[in-house]
């Protein structure tokens, strides 16, 4: 898959991160470039981390499925040492090198990418799902398992029905949705990434839900795969 190299990762402090984010924020597109009914393939993206000899390592898994049959079409991964320092609010900078490396291995070009993480629902609207979209050139959706509290704003719990949701409003702006994908199970937190609107994100996500998990199928598969890969690499000290 072709990757758009919009910036490098020779970034070492918060001022570098802020400058890079600010150069992209005004380019975020919250209008859909594809209709949910036209989505044929969906990719799930997740990462897992561990320490080895005092050094941080990570693995990224991308799993592509057929949107209709839900069968796996392709899966790729990348593994390596994490070189970008962690700074709160700028996690994407640590994750993107591995995401890009894995995506470059894809033979398929998924119609949409679903990330285990936030997109527009972020302090600067630049969660990993949004930031990664500029490299991938595809619509992206953020799927977070836990709520990122911004400016002290809580979310309203959706009704206990599959598909129920409440919009997350912060200073009068919709950042995302708290979405119930299974009864009697905690909601997930949905947000646009880039080149997609919230309603399309919702429709695509709900089409990817089954009875096995509250997470969309490709995200759940990527999550499971990263745990398997992390165990393998930790055990074999690769």
Swiss-Prot record:
Site for Interaction with target DNA, residues: 86
User: Domain of life of the organism in this record?
Assistant: Bacteria
**Annotated GO biological process:** DNA repair
Q: Which GO terms describe its cellular component?
A: cytoplasm
Q: Name its cellular compartments.
A: Cytoplasm
What are this entry's molecular-function GO terms?
deoxyribonuclease V activity; magnesium ion binding; RNA endonuclease activity, producing 5'-phosphomonoesters; single-stranded RNA binding
- Keywords noted in UniProt: Cytoplasm, DNA damage, DNA repair, Endonuclease, Hydrolase, Magnesium, Metal-binding, Nuclease
Chief location bin = cytoplasm
Q: Which reaction is the catalytic activity of this chain?
A: Endonucleolytic cleavage at apurinic or apyrimidinic sites to products with a 5'-phosphate
Q: Which InterPro entries match?
A: Endonuclease-V
Return any one Pfam family short name.
Endonuclease_5
| EC code | 3.1.21.7
Instruction: Detail which positions bind Mg(2+).
Output: 46, 116
Q: Which cofactor does it need?
A: Mg(2+)
The role this protein plays is:
DNA repair enzyme involved in the repair of deaminated bases. Selectively cleaves double-stranded DNA at the second phosphodiester bond 3' to a deoxyinosine leaving behind the intact lesion on the nicked DNA.
Q: Could you say which protein family the record assigns here?
A: Belongs to the endonuclease V family.
This chain's protein is named Endonuclease V
